[in-house]
Amino acid sequence: MGYNGKRSRGSGRRDDGGLNRTMARVLLFPALLVYLELVFHIYMKTALVYAPVYVVFAIAAGFFLSALTLPWRRQANSLAAKILAVLISVIYGAEIIAKTILQSYYGPSALKMAAGNKLTDYSDVIASAVVRGIPIILILLLPSILLCLFGGRLVGFARFDLRFAGLVLGACVVFHILGLGVVHLPWKGDLTPAKLYQMDTNIDDQVEQLGLLTTLRLDVKHMIVPAKNTMGSDFEDIGNLAPNGSSSSSGDPAGSVSE
């Protein structure tokens, strides 16, 4: 029997889940994040031409989350997987509500500003938007609900060897590199995925082209390491342009008039 990542306890003992459960555990979060991204983008009516970008990044992030829920005891694995699944699904729903009410998505860096704006003053509007958004919120939460109800029977949440979790992290790295390759393909337009990946502005375009989860990850990254390329960097030298009539001081013959 091939190595499936589970700890062996006694020779000849049969793994309770087998290869199918192993694959289900590994692919649980990649499948969930791809589902959430596709449902999110279809509902928000974004350009699906960028789906290859955020699908690959979703798979990479999914492998990372799967690795976090593999090497612990059964109860800890189960609790971690269910909490992560519900939390991430709620984040997608919350961003839809934020876009509906505030006409923009909100990353972690904007939470302080949002708190300062006393959002409680808009509690009625928020409550109304949440009620109207219940159908899409339930669709987003559906996989997490099924995981909470039937996850123990379907995937088992058995403890896997730490080395196997390391292999899953390796898959995360491979797909992340693949995602960077897709980002740097020759996409059309002024704001391409490659440019948006380096920015800390244009969050709506980032969400559309890079995906919601990648945008939020980049927002956290840029809170620690400031972005090098923003929209403002294209115009930072405008203030150094010479005003009318100052060209004569530059030594340009065209700027001087002989008397």
Residue map of PLM features:
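Transmembrane and membrane-interface helices of multi-pass
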Residues: 2-6, 10-227, 244, 253
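Helix-hairpin-helix/helix-loop-helix acidic hairpins
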Residues: 230-232, 255
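Intrinsically disordered, low-complexity N-terminal segments that are enriched in acidic
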Residues: 233-234, 238
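Long, well-ordered, tryptophan-enriched scaffold segments
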Residues: 239-245
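Beta-strand elements within well-structured catalytic alpha/beta cores of enzymes
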Residues: 247, 254-259
